């Protein structure tokens, strides 16, 4: 089994819904982006091309982050996912330096610490962040998704790294990753590339594909097909 994703850049509308869905699903703190994007402009006016390229962990078959991790915190599972044992992470950041995609983040501060602030932004007009937490009976953040904690800490520790897990907790329930389910245009297709009958495998066979940083030789499992062209919409 080799799970991964195909992203159709012709269908992608650049709405950022994938980024928001990921953040909500995985309780990521400010500044931590498991799902992100690259804005790229090429050429000179009037011959200018703009590209919006969604990014995430590529769950590489030959993952550099797994190779360099001194504690085994980064590892591959039987489905081909690149996962992390947060309890084993010592915060050395070797995985971050080794990752050719820049998709691993580091918690320099205590995640979500802004919610511990007991001072209101406007006195006698607003509740403090800490008051909001108390109202919803939470100790970390008011919109916590408890299901994230089924396979990985709901909120990660200070001085540890974190990254996309392809929503492994949702896969265990027979669901697709949150970014895939949230995409309004169906630009993201998740599947098993080792299964020739999967939609993901069929798309890779049908289209000319692109992958990021192939020179790194990590055998990434995120493929991009087509590119946005307004003429193809009509």
Language model region names:
Residues 1-234:
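Non-ligating segments of multi-cofactor redox enzymes
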């Amino acid at each position: 089994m080799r799970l991964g994703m195909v992203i159709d850049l012709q269908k992608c509308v650049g709405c950022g819904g994938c980024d928001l869905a990921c953040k909500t699903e995985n309780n990521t703190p400010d500044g931590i982006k498991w799902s992100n994007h690259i804005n790229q402009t090429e050429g000179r006016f009037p011959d200018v091309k703009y590209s919006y390229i969604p990014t995430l962990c590529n769950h590489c078959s030959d993952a550099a982050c797994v190779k360099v991790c001194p504690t085994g915190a980064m590892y591959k599972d039987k489905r081909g996912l690149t996962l992390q044992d947060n309890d084993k992470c010592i915060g050395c950041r070797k995985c971050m330096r080794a990752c050719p995609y820049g998709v691993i983040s580091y918690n320099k501060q205590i995640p979500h610490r802004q919610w511990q602030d007991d001072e209101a932004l406007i006195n006698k007009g607003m509740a403090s962040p800490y008051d909001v937490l108390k109202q919803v009976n939470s100790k970390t953040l008011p919109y916590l998704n408890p299901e994230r904690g089924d396979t990985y800490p709901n909120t990660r520790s200070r001085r540890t790294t974190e990254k996309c897990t392809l929503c492994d907790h949702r896969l265990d329930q027979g669901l697709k990753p949150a970014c895939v389910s949230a995409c309004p245009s169906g630009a993201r297709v998740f599947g098993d590339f080792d299964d020739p009958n999967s939609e993901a495998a069929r798309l890779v066979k049908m289209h000319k594909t692109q992958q990021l940083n192939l020179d790194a030789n990590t055998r990434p499992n995120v493929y991009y097909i087509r590119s946005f062209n307004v003429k193809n919409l009509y």
